[in-house]
């Protein structure tokens, strides 16, 4: 049967007639090829592609029929469709400028097959082949934005945040031009994930936190975004930016529903966190967040050591490296190195006396500390009152009335 299809195509290519008549006849041959199965179907479809890219066939007919051809392929078995897609792309390549729209459609379908197979890298590379900026066809902003975001997401799935960042940066140039709110949300999610994978945790936390307030996002997904914001904040390097983010999250009542709230509370209140208190939280982290740093410690260990060092600076005026190491549960030399780095980067106030082996913390003003403690107390009292009103609303109402009557 494949031979019959090839023969019909050869006869039709040498015949004359109106574009409409010829297109109708080619369409009948395509339908015949689609009805076949197995190897016969594969050979017949390949013959059809070869005929369509032949220069003897009018470009008007070729484009129209290849578009029809692309609509049929998603209904075929994935293995057959994948082979046909690759064959078609190879045959079209010498005349790719003439078939840009059809090539884009083929690449989108082929990427979907690779995605179903969880072959993320090949899926991304197939989409990269669409000439969104360099081709003759003018693609609309939403199509380009959606494609760039899909490429970035696929590279993230393949654990390649560098390539993902390259394509999210291209999407950044387009997202302000799009009015599609759903795409805007996808952009923000993808950008937050890229920052997260690139270990830019505080920027990722800010993006996730912003997403957690978007009403267009489902409530469960908003809470998921808030959870990611909290995790990224805990993993971020200690400093003013992180302190501000901790304060923002601690004041957000939704965070009390999250499993990591206990760690958040300790960090916000500048309490020392012990290693055995981190096991449950460490189990919640994603694989890329469990990576080790240059000194061999995990990202979480490093973040907690820096937090504990900052907390110690608010408890002591000065401390020896030996005592600091014991407090942080690390060797004295490592404690000195981290303290030195934090002071140099302006993330902690103080200076190091290497002769005596002491780190001196600069005296902090008492008022801001008192303010923070009072603020924390008021916050906890408010939470307590809310819980009482939820448990005993009638008693609360009576107590309020009695208070007002005094």
From Swiss-Prot:
Q: Which Pfam families match?
A: CSN4_RPN5_eIF3a (PF18420), PCI (PF01399), PSMD12-CSN4_N (PF22241)
Q: Which GO terms describe its cellular component?
A: cell junction; COP9 signalosome; cytoplasm; cytosol; nuclear speck; nucleoplasm; nucleus; synaptic vesicle
Extract one GO BP annotation from the record: protein deneddylation
N-acetylalanine occurs at 2
**Location(s) in or outside the cell:** Cytoplasm; Nucleus; Cytoplasmic vesicle, Secretory vesicle, Synaptic vesicle
Give the sites modified to N6-acetyllysine.
25
Repeat among keywords? no
- Identify the keywords attached in UniProt to this record, alphabetized: Acetylation, Cytoplasm, Cytoplasmic vesicle, Nucleus, Signalosome, Synapse
Keyword Acetylation listed:
yes
- InterPro entries in UniProt: CSN4_HTH (IPR041406), PCI_dom (IPR000717), PSMD12-CSN4-like_N (IPR054559), PSMD12/CSN4 (IPR040134), WH-like_DNA-bd_sf (IPR036388), WH_DNA-bd_sf (IPR036390)
Domain of life, per lineage: Eukaryota
Q: Which PANTHER family match?
A: 26S PROTEASOME NON-ATPASE REGULATORY SUBUNIT 12/COP9 SIGNALOSOME COMPLEX SUBUNIT 4, COP9 SIGNALOSOME COMPLEX SUBUNIT 4
| Homology family | Belongs to the CSN4 family.
Functional note: Component of the COP9 signalosome complex (CSN), a complex involved in various cellular and developmental processes. The CSN complex is an essential regulator of the ubiquitin (Ubl) conjugation pathway by mediating the deneddylation of the cullin subunits of SCF-type E3 ligase complexes, leading to decrease the Ubl ligase activity of SCF-type complexes such as SCF, CSA or DDB2. Also involved in the deneddylation of non-cullin subunits such as STON2.
Quaternary assembly: Component of the CSN complex, composed of COPS1/GPS1, COPS2, COPS3, COPS4, COPS5, COPS6, COPS7 (COPS7A or COPS7B), COPS8 and COPS9 isoform 1. In the complex, it probably interacts directly with COPS1, COPS2, COPS3, COPS5, COPS6, COPS7 (COPS7A or COPS7B) and COPS8. Interacts with TOR1A; the interaction is direct and associates TOR1A and SNAPIN with the CSN complex. Interacts with STON2; controls STON2 neddylation levels. Interacts with ERCC6.
Name listed for the protein in its UniProt record: COP9 signalosome complex subunit 4
Lineage, please?
Eukaryota, Metazoa, Chordata, Craniata, Vertebrata
């Amino acid at each position: 049967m494949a031979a019959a299809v090839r023969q019909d195509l050869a006869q039709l290519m040498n015949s004359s007639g109106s574009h409409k008549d010829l297109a109708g006849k080619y369409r009948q041959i395509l339908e015949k090829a689609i009805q076949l199965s197995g190897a016969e179907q594969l050979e017949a479809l390949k013959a059809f592609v070869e005929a369509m890219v032949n220069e003897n066939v009018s470009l008007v007919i070729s484009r129209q029929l290849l578009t029809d051809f692309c609509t049929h392929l998603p209904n075929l078995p994935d293995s057959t469709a994948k082979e046909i897609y690759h064959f078609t792309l190879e045959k079209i390549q010498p005349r790719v400028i003439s078939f840009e729209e059809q090539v884009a459609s083929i690449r989108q379908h082929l990427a979907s097959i690779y995605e179903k197979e969880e072959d993320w890298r090949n899926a991304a590379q197939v989409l990269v082949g669409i000439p969104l900026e360099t081709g003759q066809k003018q693609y609309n902003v939403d199509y380009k934005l959606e494609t760039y975001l899909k490429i970035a997401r696929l590279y993230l799935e393949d654990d390649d945040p560098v390539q993902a960042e390259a394509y999210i940066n291209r999407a950044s140039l387009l997202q302000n031009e799009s009015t599609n709110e759903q795409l805007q949300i996808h952009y923000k999610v993808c950008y937050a994930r890229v920052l997260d994978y690139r270990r830019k945790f505080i920027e990722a936390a800010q993006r996730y936190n912003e997403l957690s307030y978007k009403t267009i996002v489902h409530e469960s997904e908003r809470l998921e975004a808030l959870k990611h914001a909290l995790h990224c904040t805990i993993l971020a390097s200690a400093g003013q930016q992180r302190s501000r983010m901790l304060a923002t999250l601690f004041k957000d009542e939704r965070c009390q529903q999250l499993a990591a709230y206990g760690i958040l509370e300790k960090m916000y209140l500048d309490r020392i966190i012990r290693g055995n208190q981190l096991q449950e939280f460490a189990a919640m982290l994603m694989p890329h967040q469990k990576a080790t740093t240059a000194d061999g410690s995990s990202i979480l260990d490093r973040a907690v050591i820096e937090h504990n060092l900052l907390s110690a600076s608010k408890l002591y005026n000065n401390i020896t490296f030996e005592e600091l190491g014991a407090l942080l549960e690390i060797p004295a030399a490592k404690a000195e190195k981290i303290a030195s780095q934090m002071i140099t980067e302006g993330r902690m106030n103080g200076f190091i006396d290497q002769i005596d082996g002491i780190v001196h913390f600069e005296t902090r003003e008492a008022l801001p500390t008192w303010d923070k403690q009072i603020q924390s107390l008021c916050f906890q009292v408010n939470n307590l009152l809310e819980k009482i009103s939820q448990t005993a609303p009638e008693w609360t109402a009576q107590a309020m009335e009695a208070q007002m009557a005094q």
